[in-house]
């Protein structure tokens, strides 16, 4: 995410043993944000969600299970960055308002989590912007050529 320094990548501390893993996604005081909405998305391999964003919400995102290729883009500078998030690396990305994000599932199955922080009402679909996953303005190097898309994301194609 070097090309877009407003986007922050975090590596939480975690504990692993023969039973599995334990890690903290967020605790009060970690960020100067009040998170007020959580969402979880499950998808299969080659599903591409996004690119979506809005003008008022911060998003802390992570992959709880599986592996995804996350893309975050700055709609003003037209720069983008990418990172692989997985249950192995446990990395998290904090995305500021006005930035778009999308992800493609690399594993057979993935569970993706968003923590949202915003003032007022939730910025639902009508308050969000969408950018086509293959918009030539950004020339994003997605790791999949024929992604599985929602109707909403196909319309931006």
Question: Which sequence ranges carry the predicted segments?
Answer:
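Non-catalytic, conserved peripheral segments adjacent to functional cores
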Residues: 1-91, 109, 116-157
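Short HxH-centered metal-ligating active-site micro-motif
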Residues: 94
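Ligand-binding loop in jelly-roll beta-barrel domains
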Residues: 97-119
């Amino acid at each position: 995410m070097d090309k877009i320094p407003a986007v922050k990548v975090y590596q939480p501390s975690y504990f692993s043993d023969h039973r599995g893993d334990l890690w903290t996604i967020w605790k009060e005081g970690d960020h100067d944000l009040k998170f007020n909405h959580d969402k979880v998305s499950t998808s299969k391999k080659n599903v591409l969600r996004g690119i979506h964003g809005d003008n008022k919400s911060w998003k802390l995102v992570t992959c709880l299970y599986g592996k995804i290729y996350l893309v975050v883009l700055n709609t003003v500078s037209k720069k983008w960055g990418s990172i692989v998030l997985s249950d192995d690396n446990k990395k998290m990305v904090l995305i500021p308002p006005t930035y778009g994000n999308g992800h493609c599932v690399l594993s057979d199955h993935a569970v993706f989590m968003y923590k949202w922080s915003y003032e007022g009402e939730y910025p639902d679909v009508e308050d969000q912007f969408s950018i086509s996953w293959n918009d030539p303005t950004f020339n994003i190097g997605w790791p999949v050529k024929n992604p599985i898309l929602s109707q909403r994301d196909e319309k931006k194609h």
